[in-house]
């Protein structure tokens, strides 16, 4: 994935799930075109008698049962649509400093404008729905972590959704401008929950529900936990209106060509 800056928790979150977008925009079909009548061959058409044209009647109001077109995505999801460049050049202009005073090659303070490389294949048309928030998608709650890939896939399926592919996640984060950060080209730790120190768990952490029910596991989880409540960073939002894609918890994605 190209989108930069997820929090370094080492505790993978469940997911932001994806789904299919509606394709019907609700617009009526175009009216059929009618060809003008022609005179029969060999005869001259007689002019029509002069008749006063009636005053056009006002268009009838729409029936009370008429409903607006359905939204492209279900409630809680956002439409992600556009052309996705599959080979992008994102050149770092300024590295952040590491703890030892040197340059941190994994973190870039400022990028130049992204470019779709000359060798890139044709941009891929993308159109899909994506959860606006990390699971469970409730503002004020913390995203769920300590979840396996198979559990994440199962939970998405239980809601009639699926895991996003890696390409979908990247495009939802970058948009057509191929932004290295959802909010632009310069890293800002105040806009997203990023750049917290990584704390290594001193013991094996159980799956989420089991860990919270185990006092020793819950205490260790609380010690290394760097999550913040969903919606805490309103500026950490992608061009499509999806939050925390490069902040807070890491998310699982689907790579159909690989085994999980």
Predicted regions span which residues?
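Short, compositionally biased
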Residues: 20-157, 177-178, 184-186, 192, ...
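Sec-dependent N-terminal signal peptides
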Residues: 1-26
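Functional-site microenvironments in short loops/helix caps that host divalent-cation chemistry
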Residues: 149-158, 162-260
């Amino acid at each position: 994935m190209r989108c930069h800056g997820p929090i370094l928790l080492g505790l993978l979150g469940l997911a932001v799930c994806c789904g299919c977008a509606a394709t019907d925009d609700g617009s009526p079909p175009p009216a059929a075109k009618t060809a003008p009548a022609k005179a029969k061959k060999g005869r001259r058409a007689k002019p029509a008698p002069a008749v006063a044209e009636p005053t056009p009647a006002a268009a009838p109001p729409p029936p009370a049962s008429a409903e607006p077109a359905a939204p492209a995505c279900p409630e809680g999801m956002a439409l992600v649509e556009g052309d996705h460049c599959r080979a992008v050049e994102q050149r770092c202009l300024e590295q952040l400093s590491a703890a030892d005073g040197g340059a941190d090659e994994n973190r870039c303070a400022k990028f130049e404008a992204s470019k779709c490389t000359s060798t890139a294949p044709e941009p891929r048309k993308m159109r899909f729905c994506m959860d606006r928030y990390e699971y469970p998608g409730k503002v004020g709650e913390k995203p769920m972590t300590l979840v396996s890939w198979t559990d994440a896939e199962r939970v998405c399926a239980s809601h009639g959704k699926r895991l996003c592919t890696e390409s979908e996640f990247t495009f939802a984060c970058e948009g057509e401008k191929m932004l290295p950060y959802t909010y632009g080209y310069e890293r800002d730790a105040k806009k997203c929950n990023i750049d917290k120190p990584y704390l290594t768990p001193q013991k094996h952490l159980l799956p989420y529900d089991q860990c919270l029910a185990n006092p020793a596991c819950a205490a260790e989880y609380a010690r290394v936990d760097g999550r913040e409540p969903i919606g805490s960073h309103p500026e950490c939002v992608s061009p499509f209106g999806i939050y925390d894609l490069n902040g807070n918890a890491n998310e699982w994605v689907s790579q159909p060509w690989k085994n999980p």
